[in-house]
Amino acid sequence: MTLLETFSRPSISASDRAERLTAAGSAWGERIEADVANAQLTYRVRGSGEGSVVSRITAGKHVFLVDEPGALAGDDSAASPVEYALGALISCQIVVYRLYAQALDIRVDEIDVRAEGDLDVRRLFGIEESVRAGFGDIRLTVTLTGPESDDRYQELKAAVDAHCPVLDLFTNPTPVTVTVNKG
C-alpha cells in the first residue's frame, strides 16, 4: 500500500487558492513587519531505523517511511531518501510557482514538475572517494499551462528560482552540524 491509496486530495477552486495565497502572504507580511524575528522558522523532523534500512520519519503529525531498493540493501517498500529529496524540490517548486503566480498576476492553470538526478554510488560504497556522494546533476522540467506568454512564464521562473527554499538548499552550501550521542 502506498500513501496515495489512503490520501484524498482536497479539491480547491482557482479563486479559493488565490484567496488562500493572498491571505497567507498578507498575514506573514504583518507578522514580519511587527517583529522581524517572526520570519525565522525552525522545522523539526525525527527518524528511527527499522528493518534492513527503512526509516520511519515523523514530521509534526505526519509519519512516512523511507526505504531503498533491493540493490541498495532495502526492501523497496517506500521511496528512497534521494527520491524524497527530489520530491521535496518538486513540491517546493509547485508551492512557490503558485505563490509567485498569484503575486505577479500570472495565470497558471496547471503545473507539472519532473525531476531527474544523477547519483554516482561509488562514493556511497567507499569505492572512489574523489566523486561526490550526492547528486552530480539535477534536471527539473516545469510545464505550465495557461494563457500567458512565454515571457511572462519566464518572469515567473526567475521569481521562483530566486525564492524557492528547497532549490536554494540544493544550489547553495548550507551549514550542517551533526552530533552523535550514545543512548
Task: State where each predicted segment sits.
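Extended beta-strand/beta-hairpin segments
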Residues: 1-87, 99-183
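Alpha-helical metal-binding/catalytic segments enriched in His/Glu/Asp
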Residues: 88-93
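Aromatic- and glycine-enriched beta-alpha-beta binding-site module
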Residues: 94-98
